[in-house]
A protein has these predicted regions:
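Long, low-complexity, charge-biased intrinsically disordered regions
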Residues: 1-323
Length: 323
């Protein structure tokens, strides 16, 4: 039904129009603009819903780069505008030009799953909620990815990333359990790396910090701390320009698309994995943790390492728990 008329038109360089605001928020008054029912009806008659439906399948199965575009377009299924329809055609044109650039897996890719996550603070001007996304790669290519909008309003970018880390952790745990049930426990013998580009969110997850910035966060999101203590995941800080999940949070420029797209779909190697914050130099790469003694004792218990008791209280506690 939709035809891409290339002609002399230049092919789009990004999956969603860069710096193109399709929200109904007036930039000056910050008020929501009224809905034009006549315009919406005309756009629906053009086949806007069919357009979005046709983009959802490739987004979910073969072309993760258009996930953010589908997430944005899906928010206007009832009352679309001409600008929204134009953005959808832009995405369709980009997909056509890159139809041969799907997901790639390689035998020399990462043998253990790796998760990258990101969020864009207050990306939605109407609700002040942030968009977030994550991708889990295995054997070089993405096997789980998502681009959504937070259901809660974050007060800072660190809080948004902390909530995103928790959402991504749920899928990581599902994958770890699946691999164990399939008979591949060696693939999840080590904690799964969770790579994000916000240092504060990474620190909240790794350390037992209660600050003015995170004390109000709902308890559900602090589940991530338990996963770190149990040695199931290991958050690490990655450079923002190397975070492939950035394409799930906002409309990126053509330069960012050119840099991240091949890494996201598995056609290019992942960025260099940062050094673990728990490992000190000079110990042959062994895990030497810098957190509090209780945290260390719990980690050693998970790894079946004899704990180093430094006080009678710790000995009594370990005896009571059967360590």
């Amino acid at each position: 039904k939709f035809k891409v008329h290339r002609g002399n038109a230049k092919a789009p360089k990004e999956p969603f129009p860069y710096n193109f605001d399709i929200s109904r928020i007036d930039k000056h008054s910050r008020q929501e603009l009224p809905i034009d029912p006549v315009e919406s009806r005309k756009v629906l008659e053009k086949g806007f819903r069919e357009l979005v439906g046709g983009l959802l399948w490739p987004a979910r199965n073969a072309y993760p780069a258009i996930s953010f575009a589908c997430s944005m377009l899906s928010r206007y299924m009832q009352t679309p505008t001409e600008d929204v329809f134009s953005a959808g055609i832009h995405t369709l044109h980009w997909l056509y030009e890159h139809r041969h650039e799907g997901i790639v897996f390689s035998s020399d890719g990462n043998m253990e799953p790796i998760c990258l996550y990101d969020s864009a603070h207050m990306q939605d001007l109407s609700s002040h909620k942030s968009s977030y996304g994550f991708v889990i790669t295995w054997m070089g290519g993405p096997i789980v990815y998502s681009s959504k909008r937070h259901t809660l309003v974050g007060l800072s970018s660190a809080e948004d990333e902390y909530m995103t880390l928790t959402h991504a952790y749920k899928w990581v745990m599902w994958l770890r359990n699946l691999l164990q049930e399939m008979g591949y426990p060696q693939l999840v013998a080590k904690p799964t790396l969770m790579l994000g580009d916000n240092a504060q969110a990474d620190r909240w997850a790794r350390e037992a910090m209660v600050t003015n910035g995170n004390r109000h966060i709902e308890r559900d999101f602090h589940k991530i701390k338990e996963a770190v203590e149990r040695n199931l995941i290991e958050p690490r800080k990655i450079k923002g320009e190397e975070n492939t999940s950035d394409m799930f949070t906002k409309a990126v420029s053509r330069e960012v698309t050119a840099h991240l797209h091949d890494m996201l779909r598995g056609a290019a190697p992942l960025p260099e994995i940062p050094v673990s914050p728990y490992t000190l130099s000079g110990h042959g790469g062994s895990s030497v943790y810098r957190t509090d003694p209780e945290h260390v004792r719990r980690r050693n218990k998970e790894l079946a390492i004899a704990p180093k008791m430094s006080s009678p209280d710790e000995k009594s506690d370990a005896k009571h728990q059967g360590v």
